[in-house]
């Protein structure tokens, strides 16, 4: 949904006039840029997303128009990164967030970063609208690499993945294979371990002898008050599982 909210909030666009955009109309107007609109903003995107998807399904909005909005927003993002990149003083990366999730709000988000100065990048990013399965993202990155476009995916907030970020099965419930491991490692060889929304290092349930295992824990699935399953959600445990697999060869 890259660029969609900004377009829907702008008077004079087809998005603005669509009934599905009512929640975000004028949300960025000067009179609304204050803390009193925080409650509205926290609710606006979810409603806009659901209503807009329904409008696409019912053909009340043109999916081609939405695609053109995303392409323009992506071009603006690339231009901003290029404009502000000042090596040695301020480094920018051309990238975006792939926001996949499980049906129960388990977080499967990745930051996707492209190598270089933007001379060779895709015309539009791969999103959950293309596929909600990370395997689809990695296969897309492989295809880009064949065209000379190098990229890197960085999983983040695995702590909120409900056990799916480092599950011992793929997205379709199949056992992990050598081909799966190679596909994943080719495209996301690193992982974020900590950030403001909690650490993804370990959990007291997984590291019972580590007195620091409860440091900066955010135990919920992202944007919910539902507990996230620890097993399969933390990096240290994932590393141990990987070592077991390697030793079992």
Region locations from a protein language model:
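Extended, charged catalytic domains and RNA/DNA-binding interfaces, predominantly
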Residues: 1-249
């Amino acid at each position: 949904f890259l660029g969609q909210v900004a377009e829907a909030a702008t008077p004079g666009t087809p998005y603005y006039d669509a009934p599905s955009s009512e929640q975000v109309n004028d949300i960025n107007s000067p009179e609304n840029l204050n803390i009193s609109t925080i409650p509205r903003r926290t609710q606006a995107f979810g409603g806009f997303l659901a209503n807009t998807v329904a409008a696409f399904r019912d053909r009340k909005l043109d999916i081609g128009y939405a695609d053109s909005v995303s392409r323009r927003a992506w071009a603006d993002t690339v231009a901003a990164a290029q404009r502000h990149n000042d090596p040695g003083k301020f480094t920018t990366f051309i990238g975006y967030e792939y926001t996949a999730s499980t049906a129960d709000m388990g977080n499967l988000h990745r930051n996707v970063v492209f190598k270089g100065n933007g001379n060779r990048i895709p015309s539009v990013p791969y999103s959950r609208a293309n596929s909600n399965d990370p395997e689809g993202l990695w296969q897309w990155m492989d295809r880009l690499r064949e065209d000379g476009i190098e990229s890197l995916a960085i999983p983040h907030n695995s702590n909120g993945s409900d056990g799916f970020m480092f599950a011992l099965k793929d997205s379709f419930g199949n056992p992990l294979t050598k081909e799966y491991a190679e596909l994943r490692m080719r495209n996301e060889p690193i992982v974020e371990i900590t950030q403001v929304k909690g650490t993804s290092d370990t959990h007291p349930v997984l590291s019972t002898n580590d007195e620091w295992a409860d440091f900066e824990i955010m135990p919920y699935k992202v944007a919910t008050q539902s507990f996230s399953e620890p097993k399969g959600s933390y990096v240290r445990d994932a590393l141990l599982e990987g070592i077991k697999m390697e030793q079992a060869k």
